[in-house]
A protein has these predicted regions:
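Conserved alpha/beta-hydrolase "acid-adjacent" motif
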Residues: 104, 108-113
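Serine-hydrolase catalytic machinery in alpha/beta-hydrolase-like enzymes
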Residues: 1-43, 88, 122
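Short beta-strand/loop motif that positions the catalytic acidic residue
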Residues: 95, 101-103
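Catalytic histidine-centered segment of alpha/beta-hydrolase-like enzymes
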Residues: 125-138
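Gly/Ala-rich beta-loop-alpha elbow adjacent to hydrolase catalytic centers
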Residues: 48-56
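Conserved hydrolase catalytic core segment
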Residues: 58-67
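Active-site nucleophile loop of the alpha/beta-hydrolase fold
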Residues: 7-8, 69-78, 106, 125
Length: 151
């Protein structure tokens, strides 16, 4: 079962995201619904693209996800004035389940490092990951097949 979830602020037609706490609460509610009505005891692999990847990472313990898939994780926020951007690496380091990050080689939001349970695959392109969608799909498929999670 695959569920495509659109963030509430996008559904409402807004360009700016809601505060992290509200995004996380909405995500947890969706996962609770899926666990009750859709997953039928199957493992949960949470994931998202860009901001959605951050939400999946921040909520991994609350949702009980067995693994996390991050497409275009925004490691560094856009620079603002003279203030250096603050890395979001702690959000990745807090994840204790297997994780795949698929990142564009020229992603302006940075390149996350590999970690103990964190595999990083770089593909041609930028933050949009549209240049080589076949490579993105292949990386995800290979990772899913190799996951040590019972089906």
């Amino acid at each position: 079962t695959v569920a495509l979830v659109e963030q509430p602020y996008r559904v409402a037609g807004r360009r700016s995201p809601a505060p992290a706490k509200r995004l996380d609460e909405a995500w947890i509610a969706v996962i609770e619904h899926l666990r009750t009505d859709e997953l039928d005891g199957r493992p949960l692999i949470a994931g998202g693209r860009s901001l959605g990847a951050r939400v999946a990472c921040r909520t991994v313990e609350a949702t009980g996800a067995e693994a996390v898939l991050c497409l275009a994780f925004p490691l560094l926020p856009p620079a603002r004035g003279n203030k250096p951007p603050q890395s979001r690496l702690p959000e990745l380091e807090a994840v204790s389940v297997p994780m795949l990050i698929v990142q564009g080689e020229s992603d302006r939001f940075g390149r996350p490092p590999e970690g103990a349970d964190r595999q990083v695959v770089r593909v041609a392109g930028d933050h949009g990951l549209k240049k080589d969608t076949a490579a993105v799909g292949a990386a995800v498929a290979d990772w899913l097949i190799a996951l040590p999670i019972p089906a």
